[in-house]
């Protein structure tokens, strides 16, 4: 990258799990917090991109993201509006549940405001813990 090209940056995208959040420590690092603050102070739009649903997007004290790409960009929004929504077709959801059942893994199904799982294992519990949440296991 050219030395002068940094001033041309208008938006920065960040994944949550493994990028913003250290997966071993389950927290955002102080260095990342400072980096995000520096970008924001320089007028760069901060975008969080994640596979998580909107209600599982973690918040980070002192950091104000502008745009959120949730559910792997199938649901995109700002604080004021939904920009894009493209839910997974029901037939595909059924196939995912069946395939997961065959390998004895729980599945969490979710919408914009919440969801539930057909069971829970350590991987799923750890994933929810990053957003300071618990798996909602349905009967």
Where are the language model's segments positioned?
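A short, Lys/Arg-enriched amphipathic alpha-helix followed by its capping loop at the start of a domain
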Residues: 2-12, 31-44
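Short hydrophobic/aromatic-rich motifs at helix boundaries and adjacent loops
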Residues: 4-8, 25-28, 45, 65-70
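Asp-based phosphoryl-transfer active-site loop
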Residues: 8-25
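Residue-level preference for alpha-helix termini and adjacent loops
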Residues: 19-20, 27, 62, 87, ...
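Short, solvent-exposed loop/turn segments at secondary-structure boundaries
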Residues: 24-27, 81-83
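Active-site phosphate-binding/coordination module
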Residues: 33-129
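Short, intrinsically disordered, charge-balanced linker/junction segments flanking boundaries
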Residues: 128-139
């Amino acid at each position: 990258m050219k030395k002068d090209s940094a001033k041309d940056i208008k938006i920065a995208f960040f994944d949550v799990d493994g990028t913003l959040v250290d997966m071993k420590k389950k927290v955002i690092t102080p260095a990342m917090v400072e980096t995000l603050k520096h970008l924001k102070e320089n007028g760069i739009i901060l975008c969080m991109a994640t596979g998580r649903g909107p209600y599982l997007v973690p918040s980070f004290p002192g950091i104000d993201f502008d745009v959120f790409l949730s559910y792997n960009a199938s649901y995109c929004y700002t604080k004021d509006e939904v920009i894009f929504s493209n839910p997974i077709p029901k037939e595909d959801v059924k196939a995912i549940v069946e395939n997961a059942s065959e390998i004895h893994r729980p599945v969490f199904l979710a919408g914009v405001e919440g969801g539930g799982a057909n069971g829970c294992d350590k991987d799923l519990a750890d994933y929810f813990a990053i957003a300071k949440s618990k798996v909602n296991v349905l009967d």
